[in-house]
């Protein structure tokens, strides 16, 4: 995790890397995604946001406790728990999902598709509505999550969108 002043935004930003998550009520949270997925959770009543960044759905071997955030099977429930520990109510949570790019040729390993499908299915299982998603393109993206309005700005190599 890196905290820095973003001159373009004119404010402090917390950047998370693969395997990390962060919860805040006042800081912009950012990360860069390819085939990885970030789940953005927010509680509009308690004014709280949380973002994770996972690499794969699961590991085929035993996972060290410090590496659990790299795998969706752990990263998603850990983010939900962190939101609740910081004052969110599970019944207020909503999700926005990003990443899941596929850079490989069709018919090969599709990590991005697996990651994005897992996120959607997991949040459905937890009863958290997905209100926006940006998946399955063959390009990277950088996201900025804003705590004051829960908007996510997604920057691509060739443009940007707001979710």
UniProtKB/Swiss-Prot annotation:
Keywords: Chemotaxis, Hydrolase. InterPro entries: CheD-like_sf, Chemorcpt_Glu_NH3ase_CheD, Cytotoxic_necrot_fac-like_cat. One of its GO terms (molecular function) is protein-glutamine glutaminase activity. GO terms for biological process: chemotaxis. It catalyses: L-glutaminyl-[protein] + H2O = L-glutamyl-[protein] + NH4(+). Gene3D superfamilies: 3.30.1330.200. It is an enzyme of class 3 (hydrolase). Its EC number is 3.5.1.44. Probably deamidates glutamine residues to glutamate on methyl-accepting chemotaxis receptors (MCPs), playing an important role in chemotaxis. Belongs to the CheD family. HAMAP family: CheD. NCBIfam families: PRK13494.1. This is Probable chemoreceptor glutamine deamidase CheD.
